[in-house]
């Protein structure tokens, strides 16, 4: 059950990650009138957050929270960041936008290492590669499905804000599911 839940959440996490990196520049340019270079720089800030997040979240999971609670925290941060991104205004101070996008990147791009380590830990003994491959099927399905859904919602509502608001819903659902998931022991190997 834990591996299935992790796979489902990775599906949604990858939807958030790929939608963010696919549409952020266009959103900043089209909806907020940023120049392409400035919008690209802000995407770089998001990516830098992801680099730092991959390292920092591993430490947080190992030393303090455990993987499941860290992933629940990351889902909360994704939801809050997606909401803040949907509510961005052109008159906001640039440092505020940098901060929002840094946290968004740290959570939406930085989740993968904690997730993969937990999948390997939850796998039956000797089956980590099978569990990882199986769950990554769902992860990459989210990569394929997420951006077109985000784009369709944005087109239907005439703004990229709608897509970011949809990410709030998916991230919040994952946070709730992961928070309620009972920490489970490592599964024994099948006989």
Predicted features, each with a name:
Residues 2-58, 112:
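Extracytoplasmic gate region of multi-pass secondary transporters
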Residues 27, 31-32, 63-64, 118-123, ...:
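Helix-to-coil boundary motifs at intracellular loop junctions of multi-pass secondary transporters
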Residues 53-66, 154-155:
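Helix-to-loop junctions at the C-terminal end of transmembrane segments
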Residues 67-118:
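C-terminal transmembrane helical hairpin of 12-TM major facilitator-type secondary transporters
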Residues 120-159:
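A late C-terminal transmembrane helix in Major Facilitator Superfamily
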Residues 165-191:
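Multi-pass alpha-helical transporter architecture, strongest
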């Amino acid at each position: 059950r834990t591996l299935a839940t992790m796979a489902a959440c990775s599906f949604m996490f990858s939807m958030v990650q790929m939608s963010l990196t696919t549409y952020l520049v266009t959103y900043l340019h089209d909806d907020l009138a940023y120049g392409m270079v400035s919008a690209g720089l802000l995407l770089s800030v998001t990516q830098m957050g992801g680099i730092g997040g991959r390292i920092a979240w591993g430490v947080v999971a190992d030393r303090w929270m455990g993987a499941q609670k860290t992933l629940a925290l990351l889902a909360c941060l994704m939801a809050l960041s997606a909401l803040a991104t949907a509510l961005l205004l052109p008159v906001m101070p640039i440092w505020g936008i940098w901060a929002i996008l840094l946290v968004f990147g740290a959570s939406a791009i930085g989740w993968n290492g904690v997730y993969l380590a937990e999948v390997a830990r939850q796998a039956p003994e000797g089956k980590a590669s099978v569990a990882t491959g199986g769950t990554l099927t769902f992860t990459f399905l989210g990569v394929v499905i997420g951006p077109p859904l985000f784009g369709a919602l944005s087109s239907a509502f005439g703004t990229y804000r709608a897509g970011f608001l949809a990410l709030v819903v998916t991230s919040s659902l994952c946070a709730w599911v992961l928070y309620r998931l009972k920490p489970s022991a490592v599964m024994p190997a099948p006989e």
